[in-house]
Amino acid sequence: MNKGISRRRFVKLAGTAIALAALPGCGALAADENAKQPVKTKEKVAGTGGEHYVPYNERSGAEAVVYFTRDLSAAGLLKIYDRVKANLGGKVAIKLHTGEPHGPNIIPRPWVKKLMADKLPGANIIETNTYYGGGRDTTEKHRETLKTNGWADFTTVDITDEHGTAMLPVPHGKWFTEMSVGKDTLNYDSFLALTHFKGHAMGGFGGSNKNIGIGCADGQIGKKMIHAGDSGSQWGVNQEEFMERMTESTQAVVSHFKDKIAFINVMRNMSVDCDCAGTSAKPVVTPNIGIVASVDILAADQACVDCVYALPAESKKDLVERMESRHSLRQLSYMKDMGMGCDRYQLIDIDNGDKVINAQEAVKGIKGTWVPDGN
């Protein structure tokens, strides 16, 4: 790995490479189908269609449950966490993106501090070192960045590949039979993916799938398996193949924790660039929407994508262009192919007596572009 590559250079190269390449039971049901018809491992050909959004009425299969709140605050986060916490016990890992130095869009630290103090006092935030050079590619630099960004003020972050790596099996994988993750990931009994939903230079969008698939893969081996593959180039994998490799990495972690896992996506400060871009991230244009939570990873990410697509044209165009140009919607279809969850769901509006709504109703009244919320 070229340790000298900078974060800014990473974002630029990622974009260039892509341009050149121009409820529980849901997942179990799908997994049973995959068990009957396993993904072929000899024909390593990426799927297609990652640039095409599939409307809700064109999807089939069972429905999961996704909770939704417009309350973008610590109180809103705690309220929605209560809806998905039932199976989170023992030693809990909270996987979130702690960001590059001074990253402007990461989840507000006071929200996470309140969640941990009131709901998860024995939990740890977990992270891994990065594949690219910057503020987090070594444990020493990573810890300095954690101080800079305010995480060290209230918790100790477990950098899970600090003490080595471990291999987790990838059920029904096309690209992998196993994935390399930070060894300390195995020290936890349950897992909460607390994700800042936003765009991504290579992934198109970063939801729970990206947070886990890239964020739990260790910096030296796992991330290289995803990004480089057999190409011989540091950033040689992109578009549908990248989405599939990332998703298989996620599958390794999700399968390891079984039903002891939940997913929360925060749709706030949604730059087209990931928090790995730090201060070089493009300005936020897409307006804030709210928070979703589910025990179904596909349904959680799909609901966020649906909410973005339900926005007015001028509000969504930048983020939608990023998603479609990177063929990122293959993340969703491949999670379904892998038996990881449902792309259909009941969206429960916890702000209004648990009324079942759709994405259009969730974003009703949102127009224009992003306005800072003061957090």
Where are the regions a protein language model picked out?
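N-terminal and secondary-structure boundary signal
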Residues: 2-5, 9-21, 27-375
